[in-house]
Amino acid sequence: MKKLVYLISPGKINKKFYNSLNAVLSQGNVKFFQLRLKKIKANRFLKIAKKIKKITSRHKVKFIVNDNFNLAIKVKADGCHMGQLDGSIKIAKKKLKNKILGVTCHNSKILANKAIKNKVSYLAFGSFFKSKLKPNARKANLDILKWAKKNIKKPIVAIGGINNFNYKKLIKSGAKYIAISSFIWDNPKLKPELAIRKFK
């Protein structure tokens, strides 16, 4: 199975989550797992992150921390993902050294070129479809993926409302990875380990 999924955590982590994550990652199509928790104390975050790191390492999945490069370094994550409002990408790159650094570029060629100048590891574009995770996210269209495929040598991640019916057009347009969260963790019809199998 191709490793094309960039999996994002649910907004809240409970005790059952770790077994569920283990089952999902054992399906073999996840390349990255991003821990994205807002409004959480640092010590609680570190506890959760350490447990997750053990699971991602077991499955050879890259562990990415959202927003906070200092926490990413502390938990020995493989890298950090930053939005445009999460602080200086230049400083993050300096601190993270050879770790993975990904940046959200929305639907913007200007932001993409700026990210490339800062030597990021991958670029994320979106939101391509309506997303439960970020209902008010800026919209992106497929043209940005086609442009990125032609002009950017770094891997491209597509974000926003992605499901088993729409992901293939993103891959065809130029995305190397597809970022998924709600379809896996909040799926009313499928358990997470079955939902992840829809992306081959």
Regions found by a protein language model. Give the residues of each.
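Alpha-helix-loop-beta-strand connector modules within alpha/beta enzyme cores
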Residues: L46-V65, I91-S108, A137-N164, R197-K200
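N-terminal active-site wall of soluble small-molecule enzyme domains
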Residues: F32-K95
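Catalytic cores of alpha/beta
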Residues: V24, F63-C80, N107-S121, K149-A158, ...
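Active-site mouth loops of central-metabolism enzymes
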Residues: M1-N19, I100-N107, V157-A158, I162
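N-terminal small/glycine-rich loop or linker at the start of catalytic domains
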Residues: M1-S9, G87, A92-K94, K149-K150
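Glycine-rich phosphate-binding active-site loops on the catalytic face of alpha/beta enzymes
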Residues: Y6, Q84-A92, A124-A137, Y167-K200
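Catalytic domains of carbohydrate-active enzymes, especially glycoside hydrolases
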Residues: N22-R36, N118
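Short secondary-structure boundary segments
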Residues: G11, L37, Q84, C105-N107, ...
